[in-house]
Amino acid sequence: MENPMTVLKPLTGLVVIDEAQRMPGLFPVLRVLADREDNPATFLILGSASPELSRQASESLAGRVELIEMRGFDQSEVGEDSLDPLWMRGGFPRSFLSKQEEDSMVWRKNFIATFLERDLSNLGFGMSPVAMGRFWTMLSHYHGQIWNGNEIASSLGVAPNTAKSYLDALEQTYMVRRLQPWHVNLGKRLVKSPKIYIRDSGIFHTLQGLRSRADVQTSPKLGASWEGFALEEVIRAIQADELYFYSIHSGSELDLLAFRNGRRIGFELKFEDAPSDVEVFRNCKRRP
């Protein structure tokens, strides 16, 4: 769109604009159009998770825009009977809806390759696809664990700041969730580094080379896989105001501590047949 003002000004009703990250001059124009008194048009802007897109939207359209994250399928959309394939394949539609497990795995492998070789560059991230691929695979081994940038950087042979920039890129493109610890003065030494999760369970399984339900079931990453999958499902279901994890060096931990409408809600996410009483709930409950 070479002349967005000329094209968009006459339009009324709902106007859909796709690939907005490729139109650097769009957002100042939308600001002018959004401020018209009669407000004849509403704009639905679609685009990939580009840092530049987010920056322009927040700067040019502050107070005029609502950001909506388009996620994959969740349990409420596919039904309880499809929970297991959702866990195995993840929520990307083409992966989940594939007729065969092998087709799903092939799609995820192709997605990862395309993301590394084309999408990151198109979104403004200037990093080596090979280096990022190695980092992403290594990060999957830390799925559900406390971030240790120095250790990961040392294993990859890069500087800690470089490892952090890789993590930032994956978080900004919604591939990774960085869950911060709950920081209050509890009189005990709290863990202060974030936990890291690969957000889509199917992508996590692909990075780990887990091709089937049997592979996942026998993998030492079974518990971590379920924890990450359940975490994303809970987060989408509860619509919390703030999200943390709670952990102290004595070993007490909540996988998810959500704040919603002034209430604290704690979750312990385990792959077990029957839940058991967890001491950390009592510890957390006694805190202010």
Labelled PLM ranges:
Residues 101, 105-264:
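Accessory nucleic acid-recognition modules appended to NTPase machines
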Residues 263-273:
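Active-site ExK catalytic segment of metal-dependent nucleases
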Residues 271-288:
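Catalytic cores of nucleic-acid endonucleases
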Residues 18-20:
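Walker B catalytic acidic pair
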Residues 1-14:
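Short glycine-rich substrate-engagement loop in P-loop NTPases that contacts/grips substrate
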Residues 51-67, 81-82:
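Short regulatory helix/loop adjacent to the ATP-binding pocket of P-loop NTPases
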